Amino acid sequence: MFLKNKNIIYTCVISFLLILICVLAKADDENRNHRLIISEYLSNNKEFASSFIQYSNVSFQEGKFFLKKNRLRIEYTAPTQIVFVIKDSNAMYYNIDLKEVEYFNPKNTVAKIFFDFFYNEKFLEDIILNNEEGSFSFIKKIKIKDEINNINIIFEKSPVKLRKIEITNSEGLTSFTIVNADYNPNLDDKIFSLANPLLN
């Protein structure tokens, strides 16, 4: 009787483990498929422009976002006019209203998150996928200057479109909602120049 009960328990445990393995394998396949979808989306859209709405600490800012040739340009248009031009190892901050220009290394700033998302193939390696009905998102933790930044990037499913980037850290939640994306903007290379605009 004891052996019979032991065999039943053993069979139940094995069955549970097999089901668990199947579920985990399916989830792993789903993660892999979504990584491929995102990689393909990013590789097919090496040049695009969009407007965005940024929400941070109960304040809203509007702006435009441009991407081309391993460079990013972020323009804040309201309420303050500020421009960032970012490449891998150098970036420029230009406050149009105050006529101030500063250069900085983006690797130790939140700007690194944007650059790595679009240009670093390893960025997607350790993401956690969340699959919703009409969208999917992935979560990733990034350490910058000993601070953990929780990143949540949200995509519309059909067709695949980047919709929102959320960054949560000690300063709270900052979200960037992407609107009016243009995937064939024919951007002028000059807008990505790191030359001091006050000297031109």
What is the role of each PLM region?
Residues 122-200:
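Gly/Pro-enriched, hydrophobic low-complexity segments
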Residues 109-122:
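Short, solvent-exposed helix-to-loop capping segments enriched in aromatics
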